[in-house]
Amino acid sequence: MNKFTFYLLLMFIACSSYSADYYSDFYSKFHNSMKKFTKPSNMFVDDFRNPKEVNLPWENALVRIPIGETNIYKTTIKNINDKKFPKQKYKTIIYLHGCAGIWKGTVKRMDFFAENGFAVIAPASMAREKYARSCNTDTNQGGLYRSVLKIRQIDAENAILNAKKLGWVDDKNIFLVGLSEGGITTATYNPKNSWLGVSGRIIEGWTCNAGWDEYRGVNSPYNEPILSIVAKYDPWFQADYLKGHCGQFLNKNGFSKSIIIDEDPILSKQHGVLHDPKIKKIAIDFLNSIIK
C-alpha cells in the first residue's frame, strides 16, 4: 500500500468515526429526558396558539441544507446564515419528531433526506415553555396527554407557513414527514387552505387506527400523494384498537400507497423503520416520483 492510498484510508476511517461519534454523542434539550414538562391540569387551550409559544418550535427548528453532492449545512432557523449555502430553491421536507422529542434518530433521518437533495426543517415542539408529557418510551405507553395532537398540528402548520416565506424554499415542493406522534400529526394534518397544504406526505410508525376520533384516519383535503410505512408487529401498536395500517384510510391519489412490513423477522417488530436501506429507497423513490 503506497503512502497516498494509506492516507486516503486514514481519512475515510476518520470521517466514518466522526460521523458515528456525531450521532452517538448527539444531544438535544428538546427531548423527554431533558424537558421539564407542564402538568396537564396547567395546560390551557389558549396556550396552544399563544404567539410566543407557537414561535418557539419554529425558532429552534433544526435545519439541514444540501451543499453539492457530499456536504450538508447543519444549523437552526434562528442561527441560519444564508451565505453558507448556494442561492437556489430547495425542495423541502418539514420533519415532525416523535413523542420523545428530538433525538439522534431525528438527525439521522434529516441527514439522510439532505444527502438525497432535500432541505429539511424540523420544528422542535418541546421548545414550547408549556408542554405536557405525552408518552413514556421506556414502557411504550402513549396517550398521556390527548391534546398534544392539536399542539403538534399547530406547529406543523406554522412551520409550513414560515417555510413558504423563506427565499431558499421551493414552495411548490414542500413535503410533510413524521415518525410516531409526528406520523400521527402528518396523517391528520388538515390545512385550512391550499397555501397551507403540502405536495406529499410520509407517515412512519403509525397505523392510523386509534381509540380517539381525532387521531384516527387520514386527512388529505387536496388529495396529495401519501406514503405510509409501518411494521406489522410494532410494539407500540399491539392493542386491538391500534392495530391496522394507514392503507385503510388513504386517498385515491395514484401515487399513494401503504407499506406493511410483515416478513422481515427483525424489522417487522420495530417502531422506527427508516434506517433500513430498502425502506430508505422506497421513501426517496416516492418523493422523487411526486416532485413538481
Predicted regions located by residue number:
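C-terminal catalytic histidine-bearing segment of alpha/beta-hydrolase fold enzymes
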Residues: 254-292
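Primarily recognizes the serine-hydrolase "nucleophile elbow" in alpha/beta-hydrolase
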Residues: 159-221
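Loop/turn elements at helix/coil->beta-strand transitions in domains of secreted/extracellular proteins
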Residues: 89-92, 116-119, 170-173, 196-200, ...
